Curated annotation (Swiss-Prot):
Major subcellular location class: cytoplasm
Lineage of source species: Bacteria, Pseudomonadati, Pseudomonadota, Gammaproteobacteria, Enterobacterales
PANTHER family: ATPASE RAVA
Protein's recorded name: Regulatory ATPase RavA
Species this protein is from: Salmonella paratyphi A (strain AKU_12601)
Amino acids binding ADP: Y23, G49, I50, A51, K52, S53, L54, E196
UniProt EC number: 3.6.1.-
Keywords of the record: ATP-binding, Chaperone, Cytoplasm, Hydrolase, Nucleotide-binding
Amino acid sequence: MAHPHLLAERISRLSSALEKGLYERSHAIRLCLLAALSGESVFLLGPPGIAKSLIARRLKFAFQRARAFEYLMTRFSTPEEVFGPLSIQALKDEGRYERLTTGYLPEAEIVFLDEIWKAGPAILNTLLTAINERHFRNGAFEEKIPMRLLVAASNELPEADSSLEALYDRMLIRLWLDKVQDKANFRSMLISQQDESDNPVPASLQVSDEEYQQWQKDIGAISLPDPVFELIFTLRQQLDNLPNAPYVSDRRWKKAIRLLQASAFFSGRDAVAPIDLILLKDCLWYDAQSLNLMQQQLEILMTGHAWQQQAMLTRLGGIVQRRLQLQQQQSDKTAFTVIKEGGMFSRRPHYTLPPEASASTLTLLLQKPLKLHDMEVIHITFDRSALELWLTKGGEIRGKLNGIGFAQTLNMEVDNAQHLVVRDISLQGTRLALPGTAEDSMPAEIKQQLETLENDWRQQHTRFSEQQHCLFIHSDWLGRIEASLQDVGEQIRQAKQC
């Protein structure tokens, strides 16, 4: 088997070749290629004339010697037009009921059925068996069919509670397509002279029969790690609890997981990663309402849980709360405390300085820096006599901010715990402390917890960076996930700086 990274590069180049000349259909081509490489079915929903049939025809060129069959269903379509006519010779000579299948669906690797919901019951029943079991009953014999990809298309969804639901459930990937939107792409499409029947894929990129068969075994060997399973189960529970969520059968979940395994395999990985789960948005919807719902639920999962974003924010909230508790305890211990004086009948309490504040000039540290008089202040120098007078009689108090310049007026008070508190213009306050008693505002316990959390964040970001090279995921999703991780990282960095 080729080296995983070489295989991923080859599949990427194969997809690029298939996409040539198709405008705004890259994502559809890539998912149809993934379906073809893993033996699944695709439903394309969209108005006529938007290259649905061309997508299916292109996929034939992904394989060496692949045969294609396409048919436009009508209400009058017969099984003979899809599965082949009856052999008159066999019926006449041997009395055998046998179809001549050469050139029809039973012998094609790539099948495209347009206006699929117009098919009658006889076609639908045979088609269900072909999709489920990859077998076709031809008279008295069961014949194995080589179908690797079935692309069904329509401009409408099947009616609810109709006989078509069983077939619709077999369409694992469901893509809602629209007209070309971008102006430049529309112009390029109009003037393109490319022959749609030309093979755009170099022979060196085409998949051989042996490779295809081996890859089916290799896909099954891709592991589903426990954390990824937990994300899938969380999504399943969310859908079960939402009133308007689509019903998703166990069979559909199982087939979807195999698609995720294929995504991991063709991305060069040996295990399903959270990034692969984005593919579920194209597997689990039923109609327009459930399509939007799936987008919302996958976005919540990818930007909140897949790389532990919400869990890390919850941990950060707990660390910040603990830091506030420790800082409050430390603040009570180190704050500069004055002595309350005065009798019980005094109109106003007055205070005196403690014995350790005996110098003629006192420098007190702010336990938290404040912006005072347009200056970032970390300590204030007071004249001892002026401070004593203010403690005794009140009035105006001045101090030199950071010990420089002229003394500036201060908004200062004594709190209930007899600590000096200075406030800024927005009335945010901090206690004052003597030099040598104010300790680091960030306790060692908190520093360690923040370091551990930041390391965990780096690991998650590295995991995402290693996993994001997935051909089958649109780049818009990668941008949203990256933004969610960067937001968590920024909040951690801000907490470390406080």
